[in-house]
């Protein structure tokens, strides 16, 4: 008899606001013919309110993202198809929520509640086979944020982006949940240059072959 092993490839793309995660997700999905899972920013009912009044809406927003990404991971497992995911469940818990808490924009009880819920969910999900981290300088992030022109992002401060960048670097430095590929996007333009995109594809192929 024949034993069939269904091996699903799950690639996730991580990075700060404006790093180019969504663009790269689309490009890689097209190249590999994988399904794509995007971060829910279009239908998110809390984003506008959060950027206008962070302290009031931080917990609501983080719970919404946690719920959304947990559902994505559940769907990835149940669908049984190769997928590229725009941002991971780990970024909320290791970067965004603790940053809001440290800045005094999320209360102790809300943060403990959030963290408890994440820890419970984390026990039931599988980490990505490959995590791609898009590393970027603050000036580059600011340039990209202004270029794409999302109105709710106009109020994002340099300090906020810098704090997130510091937490991203600390998280990536200790990441051991699977294969990791770090791409410095200050030195590469995968949007305008097909050659640069191919360089990324070659690096991915080397990691997952």
Task: Label every PLM stretch briefly.
Residues 57, 61-126:
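Glycine-rich phosphate-binding loop used to anchor ATP phosphates in small-molecule kinases
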Residues 13:
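Hydrophobic anchor at the beta1->P-loop junction of P-loop NTPases
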Residues 21:
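Conserved lysine of the Walker
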Residues 95-167:
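A glycine- and Lys/Arg-enriched "phosphate-lid" helix/loop adjacent to the NTP-binding pocket
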Residues 24-25:
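Post-Walker A alpha-helix
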Residues 16:
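P-loop (Walker A) phosphate-binding loop of NTP-binding proteins
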Residues 142-209:
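NTP-dependent small-molecule kinase module
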Residues 30-68:
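Conserved substrate/cofactor phosphate-moiety recognition/catalytic segment
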């Amino acid at each position: 008899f024949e034993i069939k092993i269904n091996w699903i490839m799950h690639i996730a793309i991580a990075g700060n606001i404006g790093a180019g995660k969504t663009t790269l997700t689309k490009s890689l999905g097209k190249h590999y013919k994988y399904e794509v899972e995007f971060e829910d920013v279009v239908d998110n009912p809390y984003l506008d309110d959060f950027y206008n009044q962070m302290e009031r809406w931080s917990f609501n927003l983080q719970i919404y993202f946690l719920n959304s990404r947990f559902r994505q991971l559940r769907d990835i497992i149940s669908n049984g198809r190769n997928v590229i995911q725009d941002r991971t469940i780990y970024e909320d818990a290791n970067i965004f929520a603790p940053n809001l808490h440290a800045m005094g924009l999320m209360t102790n009880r809300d943060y403990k509640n959030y963290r408890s819920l994440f820890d419970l969910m984390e026990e039931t999900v599988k980490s990505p086979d490959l995590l791609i981290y898009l590393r970027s300088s603050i000036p580059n992030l600011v340039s990209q944020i202004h270029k794409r022109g999302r109105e709710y992002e106009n109020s994002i401060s340099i300090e906020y982006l810098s704090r997130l960048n510091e937490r991203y670097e600390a998280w990536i430095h200790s990441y051991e949940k699977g294969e990791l590929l770090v791409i410095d996007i200050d030195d590469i333009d995968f949007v305008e240059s097909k050659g640069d995109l191919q360089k990324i594809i070659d690096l991915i192929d080397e990691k997952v072959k």
